[in-house]
Amino acid sequence: MSIEVRNVSKNFNAFKALNNISLDIQSGELVALLGPSGCGKTTLLRIIAGLETPDDGSIVFHGEDVSGHDVRDRNVGFVFQHYALFRHMTVFDNVAFGLRMKPKSERPNETRIAEKVHELLNMVQLDWLADRYPEQLSGGQRQRIALARALAVEPKVLLLDEPFGALDAKVRKELRRWLARLHEDINLTSVFVTHDQEEAMEVADRIVVMNKGVIEQIGSPGEVYENPSNDFVYHFLGDSNRLSLGDEGHVLFRPHEVSLSRQEIEDHHAAEVRDIRPLGATTRVTLKVEGQNELIEAEVVKDHDSLVGLAKGETLFFKPKVWQKL
């Protein structure tokens, strides 16, 4: 099921949430809407779902304009950040709910519903929890049940709004890898909202970077990271440094793309060490360059030669190995 977003705009009183957004999503694609809070990503997702109505523009599913269709007629599965499971129902009944609510003419019999529910619970690897209640589950288990429930009605499109945002970091990492594998198996057109660039990079086929109601860049994870279209995209997709070149503008580079030396070397900049911060396998060194307003951060392996006996206030010499001039 392909999705076309055509010139969509949306205002909330004086606030312009979306400004003439256009986007094509191919059938079977997993697309991330990535951006900071207030950028319009959730509003766009809700408009695709039919939960919000655009002021201008249209939404097209597989060539059909569905802008005037009710959310119930769009056949989308929606997974929210906070699970939205029914507390008084077992896991089995939660997953079966959508099937039992179908019109009588479309509703499967209870035998088929049971088969379908167990198929889905096996798919999310939680069939053994069918008789439990939501409060007896971990956060990660609840979110997988919420996903199974969304898939039970066989939606044409799966929409996920910050699906892992309420979970701790370790569980988020496990679940996003699981979601990427699951998507390969079900091949369902999916759109998910996130503000976590690492999550988008790991899960999505393509990333739509949004800011202040507009799309800044669309591309594969590699494309947007290696070839950002502007300063905003570069900074949003990871830690970054800015080195001013005066009238020639500035260059941007990542902390892990910095060469450090205790010895003065040609083309390296002198800088004062302001902070040394061990980060496990790496160490972050914060540097102050004379004449520069912004501090420079470098990350090197913890046993790097430049770190031996290094103390705050000493001078290091650095050079960006790779940089972007924007």
UniProtKB/Swiss-Prot annotation:
- Nucleotide-binding as a keyword of this entry, yes or no, is yes
Its protein name is: Sulfate/thiosulfate import ATP-binding protein CysA
Q: Does the keyword Transit peptide apply?
A: no
Q: Which InterPro entries match?
A: AAA+_ATPase, ABC_SmlMolc_Importer, ABC_transporter-like_ATP-bd, ABC_transporter-like_CS, Mo/tungstate-bd_C_term_dom, P-loop_NTPase, Sulph_transpt1, TOBE-like
Please report the record's description of how this protein sits within the membrane.
Answer: Peripheral membrane protein
- Tell me, what is one Gene Ontology molecular-function annotation carried by this entry? ATP binding
Which SMART domains would you find in this protein's record?
AAA (SM00382)
Q: EC?
A: 7.3.2.3
Q: Which catalysed reactions does the entry list for this protein? A: sulfate(out) + ATP + H2O = sulfate(in) + ADP + phosphate + H(+); thiosulfate(out) + ATP + H2O = thiosulfate(in) + ADP + phosphate + H(+)
